[in-house]
Amino acid sequence: MSDSEKLNLDSIIGRLLEVQGSRPGKNVQLTENEIRGLCLKSREIFLSQPILLELEAPLKICGDIHGQYYDLLRLFEYGGFPPESNYLFLGDYVDRGKQSLETICLLLAYKIKYPENFFLLRGNHECASINRIYGFYDECKRRYNIKLWKTFTDCFNCLPIAAIVDEKIFCCHGGLSPDLQSMEQIRRIMRPTDVPDQGLLCDLLWSDPDKDVQGWGENDRGVSFTFGAEVVAKFLHKHDLDLICRAHQVVEDGYEFFAKRQLVTLFSAPNYCGEFDNAGAMMSVDETLMCSFQILKPADKNKGKYGQFSGLNPGGRPITPPRNSAKAKK
């Protein structure tokens, strides 16, 4: 019948994994119909599951991947290929890196094969107005066609927005929102939806913690807000939570705590964009909700795969510029 029903998932996953151990950068060219099938079938599954996922430990949580496909394979080598471990990814699968297509196709294939053990949240780059600019559109156009990029957009518009692990760990891509008073507000967001320029959905994908801010502050991205430590503490107390787990910012060690360990930032793309010496990290949450971190060290040009660390400039990160550069900062 439809492409999605004719998917040979094992063949697709097998071809995507065949390049393990190859020279990084080797492409895997699936057929256009196979990719379309992955988008349509995963979209169905996303819509059949809640927009605010309720998950159970044990699981492994990963931050931004940004088209760094060979680093994604390293994460799975380290954490165990599905279904050996349960996974939650926090968004930003595409853009910036060279292999957004392989990255998103493997993730969607695993979602379809293991729908109750493998979860993907939406990042700010799973949005047409952003990935039109930062690489994914161009990669789709060069390797396939614009129509396929639009099929991905339809899929991304149905991704879940946030997850709560064992009623204690709140997970999203960006951060908190001044509009977020109850979890029911997230549950009421209707899909498919684009990411608006402001409001709850925008903030969950775009906001950032800032140690120098009390309450809410302006965000130098030109989108959403920053929030201080006491905003985190109040949110956790109000909702009887222990931890916020988010991604969205490159951090030197792959993970970084904020607000007395009440929030953690995860970033899973080592040597981000080839410009940074950051590590990538994955957070393992065990049955008792104890969190530990597995680190992918940055490759050092002179020392091979697991070289020494240099560092980021304090606070240094490539930021995504405003969605609309003419728009005044909030």
Curated annotation (Swiss-Prot):
Active site, renumbered:
H125
What protein am I looking at? Serine/threonine-protein phosphatase PP1-alpha catalytic subunit
Q: What Gene3D superfamilies does this protein map onto?
A: 3.60.21.10
Q: Where in this protein does the record say Phosphoserine is found?
A: S2, S22, S325
Instruction: Indicate which residues the UniProt annotation says bind Mn(2+) 2.
Output: D64, D92, N124, H173, H248
One GO BP: positive regulation of termination of RNA polymerase II transcription, poly(A)-coupled
Q: Which organism is it from?
A: Homo sapiens
Cite the Pfam families for this sequence: Metallophos, STPPase_N
According to the UniProt record, list the residues that bear Phosphotyrosine. Y306
An MF annotation (GO) of this entry: iron ion binding
- The encoding gene is PPP1CA
Q: Where along this sequence does the record place binding of Mn(2+) 1?
A: D64, H66, D92
Its keywords, alphabetically, are: Acetylation, Carbohydrate metabolism, Cell cycle, Cell division, Cytoplasm, Glycogen metabolism, Host-virus interaction, Hydrolase, Manganese, Metal-binding, Nucleus, Phosphoprotein, Protein phosphatase
Q: How does it assemble?
A: PP1 comprises a catalytic subunit, PPP1CA, PPP1CB or PPP1CC, which is folded into its native form by inhibitor 2 and glycogen synthetase kinase 3, and then complexed to one or several targeting or regulatory subunits. PPP1R12A, PPP1R12B and PPP1R12C mediate binding to myosin. PPP1R3A (in skeletal muscle), PPP1R3B (in liver), PPP1R3C, PPP1R3D and PPP1R3F (in brain) mediate binding to glycogen. Interacts with PPP1R39. Interacts with BTBD10. Interacts with KCTD20. Interacts with PPP1R9A and PPP1R9B. Part of a complex containing PPP1R15B, PP1 and NCK1/2. (Microbial infection) Interacts with HHV-1 ICP34.5.
List the cofactors. Answer: Fe cation; Mn(2+)
Provide the positions where the record notes the PTM N-acetylserine: S2
**In the record, which positions carry N6-acetyllysine?**
K305
Q: Where is this region: Disordered?
A: 306-330
Q: What is reported on the regulation of this protein's activity?
A: The phosphatase activity of the PPP1R15A-PP1 complex toward EIF2S1 is specifically inhibited by Salubrinal, a drug that protects cells from endoplasmic reticulum stress.
- Whether Secreted counts among this entry's keywords is no
Q: What induces it?
A: Up-regulated in synovial fluid mononuclear cells and peripheral blood mononuclear cells from patients with rheumatoid arthritis.
Q: What is its EC number?
A: 3.1.3.16
**Enzyme type, top EC level:** hydrolase
Q: Which residues carry this modification: Phosphothreonine?
A: T320
Description of post-translational modifications: Phosphorylated. Dephosphorylated at Thr-320 in the presence of ionizing radiation.
